[in-house]
Amino acid sequence: MTDSELMQLSEQVGQALKARGATVTTAESCTGGWVAKVITDIAGSSAWFERGFVTYSNEAKAQMIGVREETLAQHGAVSEPVVVEMAIGALKAARADYAVSISGIAGPDGGSEEKPVGTVWFAFATARGEGITRRECFSGDRDAVRRQATAYALQTLWQQFLQNT
């Protein structure tokens, strides 16, 4: 997805959030704030985005958004239980209506047989108690994996929570 397409998708998400009077927050690890960056590239985004969290280390995940150390130790940072706790923690900390969390292995190192480079976990949560998780395995270099993860996060937020609702 090109920068222009990411911008268009972000604008679409922003318009839907603004129409609902809703806000979104992000908790990002492997994307390093890229989702928040794309959101804030849109003029007027302060109407639907107040804050995001870049929680790259396990310590940051625990300190900033309340991911339990036991969860990190048992499952590892790139796991469904961790992204769920990231999304719920960000939702509470930001007092937002929607949260998107992302944790993955962008590469080129860090992969394993169980979690190869390109593995990314996502969680999406709402203040109404709804939520979904997704696991994707993207291909390409580090930049490509991170770009695909950013696009996937925005697309899924749009398709699962904002489109036709």
From Swiss-Prot:
Q: Name one GO biological process term.
A: pyridine nucleotide biosynthetic process
Q: What name appears for this protein in its UniProt entry?
A: Nicotinamide-nucleotide amidohydrolase PncC
Q: Which UniProt keywords apply?
A: Hydrolase, Pyridine nucleotide biosynthesis
Q: How does it assemble?
A: Homodimer.
* Disulfide bonds listed in the record: none
UniProt catalytic activity: beta-nicotinamide D-ribonucleotide + H2O = nicotinate beta-D-ribonucleotide + NH4(+)
Note the pH dependence of activity.
Optimum pH active over a broad range of pH values.
* Enzyme class, spelled out: hydrolase
Q: Which organism is it from?
A: Escherichia coli (strain K12)
What family classification does the UniProt entry report for this protein? Answer: Belongs to the CinA family. PncC subfamily.
Output the Gene Ontology terms for molecular function.
nicotinamide-nucleotide amidase activity
EC number in record: 3.5.1.42
- Record keyword Hydrolase present: yes
Protein role: Has nicotinamidemononucleotide (NMN) aminohydrolase activity, not active on other substrates.
Domain of life of the organism in this record? Bacteria
The record's InterPro entries line, in alphabetical order, gives: CinA-like_C, CinA_C
